[in-house]
From Swiss-Prot:
Record has DNA-binding as a keyword: yes
Keywords: Cytoplasm, DNA replication inhibitor, DNA-binding
Subunit text: Homodimer. Polymerizes to form helical filaments.
Residue numbers spanned by region Interaction with DNA: 116-117, 145-149, 179-185
Localization: Cytoplasm
GO biological process, one term: regulation of DNA-templated transcription
Free-text function comment from the UniProt entry: Negative regulator of replication initiation, which contributes to regulation of DNA replication and ensures that replication initiation occurs exactly once per chromosome per cell cycle. Binds to pairs of hemimethylated GATC sequences in the oriC region, thus preventing assembly of replication proteins and re-initiation at newly replicated origins. Repression is relieved when the region becomes fully methylated.
HAMAP family: SeqA
Molecular function terms from GO: DNA binding
Organism of derivation: Haemophilus parainfluenzae (strain T3T1)
Protein origin, superkingdom: Bacteria
Stated name of the protein: Negative modulator of initiation of replication
Amino acid sequence: MKIIEVDEELYQYIAAQTQSIGESASDILRRLLNLPTHATSSVDFFESVASAETPKSAVHAEPVLTEKTTEVSQPKVEPVEPPKAVKKQSDEAINHIVDKVRALLNSAEFKEEPKAVVRFLSILRTLYRTNPESFAQATESLQGRTRVYFARDEGTLLVAGNHTKPKQIPDTPYWVITNTNSGRKMLMLEGAMQSMHLPEYLIDEVRPYFVSN
């Protein structure tokens, strides 16, 4: 195995290409290079990037190139747990959440809010307060074996280090990591909303507020 040093600009570019929580660094590079998919166990790049906020990106948790320029390998880290089954909400409950989220998106306060992290927490707050049970099931379904995104106390998230920057979701018992860019915050929202069986059109209405940076 050979290790190469990846500069910060290239590292952040690769990170910004993540399209789903379960996508690995190998998947991303193969897609960018138009190479066929490679059915091997790989690291969840969403997890590895979210936990890496260092000036230098040449660390062992990152992808390393082998002698073949078309192959990418990762450290042996357990993959993300497959999403757990979440109880389907009634149409009435789903419509109620849709109305509440839309009301938030259309509010002047939300539209004028310049910070992505505040918008992120506001949407999570609305999802929880509209249906706490469904929100709880959704957050549990998003947990990985080696990465925790939501917890009921700050300490659980700090186990991975202070760099996770956990913040409490206002008016809820939940905490969430915030050391992610806008694009990855949207991936977390999308995962939660899909697990709560919310319609894709609502997710698409949320997406413009979290453009990857």
